[in-house]
Amino acid sequence: MKNAAVQKLSQTLEDDLPEVVRYVKNHNLGFFIPYNLNGDEKRYIPDFIACIDDGHGPDDLLNLILEVTGERKKDKAAKVSTARTLWIPAVNNEGSFGRWAFLEISDPWDAGNTIRAFLKDPDKVPEFVLK
C-alpha cells in the first residue's frame, strides 16, 4: 500500500500542482530529522520534500516536507510531533535555510486538495491530517 501511495503522491506533485516548482523523493539523500523514542535517538526520513511557490515568489519558495501516512506504527507520533513542533520551528527560526513546513498526507488520492488547503491556511490543517 505504501508504495502505491507514494507513487500517487509523486504523480500528483508532478502533474496536478503547478505551484510545485520541484520535488524530490527523499531516498538516499541523507536528509533526516533526529527524534527521540523512549530515550533512544532515531532518524526520521520523510517521504518527500517539495519546493512550492506559495505566493512569496520564486526567490522565497516554501520547502514542504510531505509524509504519506501508512499504517500507524508506534514511532509515527514521535516522528510527526518532532518534525512539526520542534524541527520546523527551529529551522525557520534559524532562517538561513529558507521557509519550511510539514504536512502529513493521509489520502494520496486527494493530496492535491490537501496540499492546496494547507497552502491556503497553514494554521487550519484538516483534522484528518493531525491524527
Please place each PLM-identified region on the residue numbering.
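Electrostatic, structured charged patches in enzyme active sites and in nucleic-acid/phosphate-binding
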Residues: M1-K131
